[in-house]
Regions:
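Start-transfer (signal-anchor) and selected internal transmembrane alpha helices
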Residues: 1-32, 126, 130-133
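Helix-to-loop transition at the C-terminal end of transmembrane segments
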Residues: 22-41, 55-64
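Aromatic-rich transmembrane-lumenal/periplasmic boundary elements in polytopic membrane proteins
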Residues: 29-48, 79-85
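Short helix-coil transition/hinge motifs at the ends and kinks of transmembrane helices
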Residues: 32-35, 105-121
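Short hydrophobic/aromatic helix or loop-helix immediately within or flanking a transmembrane segment
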Residues: 49, 67-114
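Transmembrane-helix motifs of polytopic, lipid-linked glycan transferases
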Residues: 99, 120-136
């Protein structure tokens, strides 16, 4: 591998790392008014905690979640059977799954009491998945 190719790889990794940390910093400082998982993103993301945290593919658990802080509603529709239907497809959740599972394992190992699918490690994994696919 020649020197220029190595330099490009390091520059790319540096820019990707800066992008991740700046995004996380802006969410933490309140520059963005909401958490990374909100509004439409919440609808795409909810398949992951439904399957891996709550073991509830019928999404009954959404009735116990706090309201979306962005004020967005209309993501879920209760059915006569008692199940809840998410109007968003699961393609985004499938792409986010490796990052979510890593966050879930880290949370279970170090902070099992906050393994709810929405705590800080899950939020950071959501940022990481967005940055990863942006640079891909």
């Amino acid at each position: 591998m020649d020197l220029y190719k190595k330099a490009y790889i390091w520059v790319f990794l540096l820019i990707a790392g800066i992008t991740f940390f700046m995004t996380a910093f802006f969410y933490k400082t309140g520059f963005f008014p909401y958490t990374p998982i909100h509004s439409d993103g919440n609808g795409y993301y909810l398949y992951l905690p439904a399957w891996f945290v709550y073991h509830d593919p019928g999404m009954h658990f959404v009735q116990n979640l706090p309201p979306d802080p962005s004020g967005f509603s209309g993501t879920f529709f209760p059915m006569p059977t008692g199940q809840v239907v998410d109007k968003y497809t699961m393609g985004v959740a499938i792409l986010q799954m490796p990052f979510f599972l890593l966050a879930h394992v880290i949370t279970l190992l170090f902070c099992p009491e906050i393994a709810d699918g929405f705590s800080i490690f899950y939020q950071l994994s959501n940022i990481a998945s967005g940055c990863f696919y942006y640079f891909l």
